[in-house]
């Protein structure tokens, strides 16, 4: 369906944490990957997203930094949360081959209503999803 149509196949590990905060983190990760819409209002006004060499400051900059990069499928392998922090990791299938990803998410407080900062990692792998 194209880069903004969200016709991307998403699977989740059966052992994935299904707590409320972990589910919020997964929704944020899928939004950052361009696999789904980023949850409305989740970004703090001064949110900072560091993704590789790029740094996006502010909600509009984060939204403009979302690029699906020929994304075909996403597998969420892990989602963990504790206090004001959460992490989501898994595998991507892209037109350029398989990749691993991880999003480290820091919320403004333990209620996980707003994201203060995100650090994202992604790299190629030889193992497909």
Give the label of every model feature segment.
Residues 1-13, 64-129:
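A beta-strand edge to alpha-helix "cap/lid" segment located at domain peripheries
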Residues 27-31, 41-43, 105-107, 113:
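Broad hydrophobic/π-residue packing in well-ordered secondary structure
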Residues 35-82:
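A solvent-exposed, acidic/Ser-Thr-rich amphipathic alpha-helical stretch
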Residues 25, 31, 47, 86-90, ...:
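Small-side-chain structural scaffolding
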